[in-house]
Amino acid sequence: MDLDEPRITGNIKEIKTGKRIDNLDMNKIMPDFFKTETENLKIINNSKNVLKKLSKFLQIIVLTNLPHKDKNKRVKALQRNDMNFPVITNSGLKGEAVKKILDKTKIKVKSFFIDDMPLNIDSVSKESSDTVCIHFIQDKRIKKLMPTPKSATISFHNWLDIENFILDNLNDDGEKETQ
């Protein structure tokens, strides 16, 4: 994989030839990848412990743009890592889904949204302006290609910083901070 741009299509190369895989081939490869590898994806450093700790104070929900038919594979992968959180599959921008989730709560709650994709951060910020939007990219190679969107409350590169930020901001008035 080359990381010339912050996307998968165009950055995947054939191992033997080094030739980039074109869009039509990617449309065939990606469904197979989700089908065979979703259950095998490794968790990110510190994510398990941080989410378990935060779950004492917050309802953790995994909102993923994984194909709906592969949802149970994601659930199994999380459960295998002792991360028993609800999983909701989505297609497209995540703002509307977050708004629907929050609209279902009977009381006003403090909400945090963590994502790597700037368009999802923008979408959630627009649809649910009270939500604290955290732009998270752990891989420094990708961070160089994907700047933090202006709509993000803050940006982090590791889960321990996210944990500290959320714990520090559970009971404040939700004013956006910059860093």
Q: For each of these PLM feature ranges, what is it?
A:
Residues 58, 108-111, 131:
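Short coil/turn segments at beta-strand junctions that form active-site/ligand-binding loops
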Residues 113-114, 118-157:
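Acidic, Mg2+-coordinating phosphoryl-transfer loop and its flanking beta/alpha structural elements
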Residues 20-23, 31-61, 68-75:
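Short, acidic loop-to-helix structural element flanking the phosphoryl-transfer center
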Residues 1-32:
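Conserved phosphoryl-transfer catalytic core
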Residues 63-68, 75, 80-97:
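A short, structured active-site edge motif that brings together acidic residues
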Residues 95-100, 142-151, 165-167:
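Short, charged, surface-exposed secondary-structure boundary motifs
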